Amino acid sequence: MTRRYWNINLKEMIEAGVHFGHGIKKWNPKMAPYISAKRKGTHIINLARTARFLSEACDLVFDAASQGKSFLIVGTKKRATDLVASAAIRARCHYVNKKWFSGMLTNWSITKTRLSQFRDLRAEEKMGKFHHLPKRDVAILKRKLSTLQRYLGGIKYMTRLPDIVIVLDQQKEYIALRECAILGIPTISLVDTNCDPDLANISIPANDDTMTSIRLILNKLVFSICEGRSLYIRNR
């Protein structure tokens, strides 16, 4: 894996609140190596470790993107919905930002069937085929299309399992991480002080509750993916 400089600095992370963990009563002992202090009943994350693992993650996604590999970004927190979508679109990644359906990856054949139905319905609507149907049927189809768009819209162009999955909240997206582990898909995950750093291939210790923190980490990863994609295009 090629090592590069990704302009990760401590001041920027402090300003974004990346270092604020959970209350000391909610911690996971496995996170001890990534905690530098306690302040007013809250664990403080060691930002030197954050910088190290974020840099490793950036190197990994850069190398993968430069080889034309695919990514899936998973973040279903309500406040992060728009952030996940815009970041994924910017880097041409697939994304899930509403709800993770159990078996989305492990039952890929079923997911593929749903995606095929979704694409067919979108095509029929665009071609005006709904106009020839009774109003009741049109209402049912539009409702189904709206539901599919809401939950599968971010993966509508996904034709195979992703090469790397990026998870923004380990506890909320635990099922997604387990599915990746079963399938052997490499994962990158933000881990707050109440998380288990052993569940992902690269765990980035960081505040996973504050949008400024999530945005900073995600933007670094997305920038690295974009740089890798540019190299891939130039070398084709």
From Swiss-Prot:
Where primarily located? plastid
What GO MF terms are annotated? structural constituent of ribosome
One cellular component GO annotation, for this chain's record?
chloroplast
Pfam family, any one: Ribosomal_S2
Q: Does the keyword Chloroplast apply?
A: yes
Biological process, per Gene Ontology: translation
Q: What is this protein called?
A: Small ribosomal subunit protein uS2c
Q: Which organism is it from?
A: Triticum aestivum (Wheat)
- Which lineage do the record's taxonomy fields give for this organism? Eukaryota, Viridiplantae, Streptophyta, Embryophyta, Tracheophyta
Task: State the gene name recorded for this protein.
Answer: rps2
